[in-house]
Design a protein with these regions (language model features):
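C-terminal structured domains
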Residues: 240-324
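Long, hydrophobic alpha/beta structural blocks
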Residues: 1-274
Length: 324
């Protein structure tokens, strides 16, 4: 992912007085700071990101201009108006970034909750370990909330967390701040597809380990081969011999997943890793991890239903066995 950080500015929100501490200078983008910000941006393009395209007259989009200082002040104050009702507030850094990705200008807004950390102070003899406040999380940790906008296409990627207000959980970021309705994330979409397929299979008494394995294989194959997952195509794979089940599946998922789940600009590696193997836990305590291509090959693995209702698993053509 070719990302070049141009400018960045950082503000702080304190829950003690619910105030914003605004900066009047941009960050000095040293190599380490550039790496830190770049890694935070890269993590927004994950399977947890909601996506959408802003309308041209969207009020939030209209706040964004080439002047990062002016934009960041406007967005930070609007964010505070919406976030201030949260019942569980922490000290947060608000980071605003102008960057290019593959040569296209982008805007990013990161909310990063600061942490308490134990720090070893080398000069202290009697009490070398102390609790320090307002520490940024490490390089490998994503922002608590993040928005990235392609300024050319108006497409956005959003990582948001719900806040609690009067006992109710609110998607304040998308609904109130952005005034937008993004698609749910690929991760949640796939969970909805899995859950619905299991529900349909149960209603037709076909929800056994073989069906669950079929679901995993189908999801993996579609993502690997097409970089997307269509509910209709998945229904054809899972319920190929049952038209009623196919139609029921499509009907029940259309509200949560009305369109194919796409991985354009989204890192699909976590989903591929999740579904690349079949994991079987047997009643006798044996656990098997079988790659999909091996599991689907009858010359490698065979499941035999015995007359007494038990199963036997025949593993074939093994050239070498190692103990790990």
């Amino acid at each position: 992912m070719d990302i070049y950080v141009k400018k960045a500015i950082i503000y702080q929100f304190s829950p003690d007085d619910t105030d914003l501490y605004l900066a009047d200078k941009f960050l000095n983008i040293t190599p380490k700071i550039e790496e830190y910000l770049r890694k935070k941006i890269e993590r927004v393009y994950s399977d947890e990101a909601k996506t959408g395209i802003f309308e041209e007259d969207n009020p939030f989009l209209e706040m964004i201009s080439d002047d990062l200082l002016e934009t960041s002040v406007a967005v930070a104050n609007r964010w505070k108006e919406e976030f201030i009702v949260s019942e569980n507030q922490k000290t947060n850094d608000l980071v605003f970034i102008q960057f290019s990705k593959e040569g296209v200008d982008h805007f990013a807004f990161l909310r990063i909750a600061l942490r308490e950390t134990l720090t070893h102070l080398g000069g202290e003899v009697d009490n070398p370990i102390k609790l320090t406040q307002n520490n940024l999380p490490g390089f490998g940790t994503g922002a608590d909330e993040a928005l990235v906008i392609n300024l050319q296409s108006r497409k956005y990627h959003l990582i948001e967390k719900r806040i609690k207000y009067n006992g109710t959980l609110l998607n304040y970021f998308s609904e109130n701040l952005l005034q937008a309705q993004p698609k749910i994330s690929p991760k949640k979409s796939i969970k909805a597809l899995e859950k619905t397929s299991q529900k349909i299979a149960e209603s037709f008494n076909t929800d056994d380990f073989q069906f669950q394995s079929k679901v995993k294989s189908a999801i993996f194959n579609h993502i690997e081969e097409e970089n997307k997952l269509s509910p209709e195509k998945l229904a054809d794979d899972l319920f190929d011999d049952n038209l009623t089940a196919r139609l029921s599946f499509i009907d029940q998922v259309k509200e949560a997943v009305p369109e194919p789940v796409t991985f354009e600009e989204i890192d699909a590696s976590r989903q591929l890793k999740k579904f690349e193997n079949q994991k079987l836990s047997l009643s006798n305590g044996i656990e098997l991890i079988v790659p999909n291509n091996v599991y689907e090959d009858a010359e490698s693995v065979e499941f035999i239903l015995n007359e007494n209702g038990t199963y036997s698993i025949l593993i074939k053509n093994i050239e070498d066995i190692q103990s790990k």
